[in-house]
Amino acid sequence: MSFTGEYHHNLDAKGRLIIPAKFREGLGNEFTVTRSLGGCLAMYSAEEWEALEDKLDALPFTNSKARDLKRFLLGSACTCELDKQGRILIPQTLREKADLKKDIVLLGVGNNIEIWDADKYFEKYHDFEDEEQLEQDWENLGV
């Protein structure tokens, strides 16, 4: 399943976050949350996480960059389950790593879902409205 769309929710005082129904369908009841690039967290379905783990396992142990990548992704990963209200509990360590406060943006980006602190997300990506820059970026990427 490909995840798309942007949703805004609040993190409650216990660190629980409502997962939009559209995302729950593709995630299933059990999935993985880990750190991601850019200062956000990423959620992967069990199937997508297994595929990512297979790629990481295939990396050469003797390569220090490969070991660093494994530490970054696997060392912070946790398995999460939805509660009866469609929420997950994001561990304190992950909330701190992503600087999550109350207002959260969930962003479907293909094979995973990014979890952003809303202020950080809007500060970092407020310039997505610059069409000339987007056109140039798309062309450079071959899109």
Which role does the model predict for each range below?
Residues 1-9, 13, 23-80, 84, ...:
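Flexible "stalk/tail and boundary" regions
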